């Protein structure tokens, strides 16, 4: 039985603790309509309120905590003892295992409260996008928990790479479409330009928003926006308590970054509590937003339906290559994380997928867990930091977020295995 007392009672909001004020969302100067006002039409009211709050702690509704218990919160904090032995490092390595949830990733942590707030409003149908499929799976399950219908626009390349993700979303009751689709004006425009377009998170996001608007449904946000990172803070809040129970003080905290929700949810409570000496955000070298992106106002979605936010971005029209870590195929970085990177509070790394594949294999062989390709990016940075501790003869405590398992990503693993090991 899960002890509900171990589940956090509050979400943590980093905005009051940022080193400087967060540049606010804004409408484009030549806008025909207000994108900020548009949010009122597509987001559940409480989700919108939380998006703009400056409160440090937000009480988690008891109904949401009940659902958190059902999905297995708190998730385990585990020590990677065999990985330590394999690397012959003096460092201790711990990981928070979000793959222990029914949907296999951290995404359910915000899907549940967003679906709850929609249901409380009397909404009957929710819409979203998904890249690798973890977010869509989480929304389909969360919607079913509150008797809501759901529609999910899945990036085409992932839709084709991961048919089992589509299956599980449909088993949970969701309707899944490969984006770009002919269901929206924006999708039809993209398909007219390129009938074989692989899709992107930005495009799928635009389709989901347009679809929600046209049908008076509500849109659920999967990453990037502040409210998502707020809900994901349960990861870091739990991890702090679990490390305290072990008497451990973390030196280095690491997570992968697509839009930033799992990294922010994991590290922000540590940053706010001034725990840890180094925070490392890890991205894909094939989507080089950390190394070549600009810090400027840009649209989170490709069609430009959402308000402009200041973030590190490759540009809303950037089409990411079809790498095996589909959840990292996004052009931008959450505004709060972008600010922390620009202020040099958070460091970044970018790795090629061949390096990630080798790191994932080491983790599988030592710890027995198949990591999601996205999460394997964090593992590569962990290995590098552990070997650095070995070289410098330092007994560091490294903690990372294993944001999901890869048991539904085996097709992607097989694809890269054929390329790398041919």
Swiss-Prot record:
Disulfide bonds: none annotated. The keyword Transcription regulation does not apply. Its EC number is 4.2.1.20. Keywords: Amino-acid biosynthesis, Aromatic amino acid biosynthesis, Lyase, Pyridoxal phosphate, Tryptophan biosynthesis. One of its GO terms (molecular function) is pyridoxal phosphate binding. Its cofactor is pyridoxal 5'-phosphate. It comes from the Archaea. The modification N6-(pyridoxal phosphate)lysine is found at residue 107. HAMAP family: Trp_synth_beta (MF_00133). Belongs to the TrpB family. The beta subunit is responsible for the synthesis of L-tryptophan from indole and L-serine. This is Tryptophan synthase beta chain 1. It comes from Sulfurisphaera tokodaii (strain DSM 16993 / JCM 10545 / NBRC 100140 / 7). The gene is trpB1.
């Amino acid at each position: 039985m899960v002890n509900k007392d171990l589940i956090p009672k509050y979400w943590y909001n980093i905005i009051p603790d940022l080193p400087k004020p967060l540049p606010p969302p804004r409408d484009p100067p030549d806008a025909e309509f207000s994108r900020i006002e548009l949010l009122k039409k597509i987001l559940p009211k409480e989700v919108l309120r939380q998006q703009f709050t400056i409160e440090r702690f937000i009480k988690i509704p008891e109904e949401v905590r009940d659902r958190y218990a059902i999905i297995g919160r708190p998730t385990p904090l585990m020590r990677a003892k065999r990985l330590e032995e394999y690397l012959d490092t003096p460092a201790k390595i711990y990981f928070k295992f979000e793959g222990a949830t029914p949907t296999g990733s951290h995404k359910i942590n915000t899907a549940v409260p967003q679906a709850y707030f929609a249901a409380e409003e009397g909404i009957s149908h929710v819409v979203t996008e998904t890249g690798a499929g973890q977010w869509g799976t989480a929304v389909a399950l969360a919607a079913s928990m509150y008797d809501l219908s759901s529609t999910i626009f899945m990036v085409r390349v992932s839709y084709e790479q991961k048919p089992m993700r589509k299956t599980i979303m449909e088993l949970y009751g969701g309707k899944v479409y490969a984006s770009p689709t002919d269901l929206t004006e924006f999708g039809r425009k993209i398909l007219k330009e390129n009938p074989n377009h692989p899709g992107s998170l930005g495009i799928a996001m635009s389709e989901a928003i347009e679809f929600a608007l046209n049908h008076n449904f509500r849109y659920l946000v999967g990453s990037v926006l502040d409210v998502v990172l707020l809900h994901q803070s349960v990861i870091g809040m739990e991890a702090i308590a679990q490390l305290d129970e072990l008497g451990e003080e973390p030196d280095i905290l690491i997570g992968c970054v697509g839009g930033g929700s799992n990294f922010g949810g994991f590290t922000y409570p540590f940053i706010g509590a001034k725990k840890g000496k180094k925070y490392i955000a890890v991205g894909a070298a094939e989507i080089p937003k950390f190394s070549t992106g600009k810090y400027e106002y840009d649209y989170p979605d490709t069609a430009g339906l959402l308000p402009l936010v200041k973030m590190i971005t490759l540009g809303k029209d950037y089409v990411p290559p079809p790498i095996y870590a589909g959840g990292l195929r996004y052009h931008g970085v959450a505004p709060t994380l972008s600010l922390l990177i620009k202020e040099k509070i958070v460091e970044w790394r970018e790795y090629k997928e061949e390096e990630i594949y080798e790191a994932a294999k080491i983790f599988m062989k030592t710890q027995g867990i198949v990591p999601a390709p996205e999460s394997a990016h964090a593992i590569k940075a962990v290995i590098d930091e552990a070997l650095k501790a070995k070289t410098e003869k330092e007994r560091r405590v490294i903690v990372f977020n294993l944001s999901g398992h890869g048991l539904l990503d085996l097709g992607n693993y097989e694809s890269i295995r054929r390329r790398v090991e041919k």
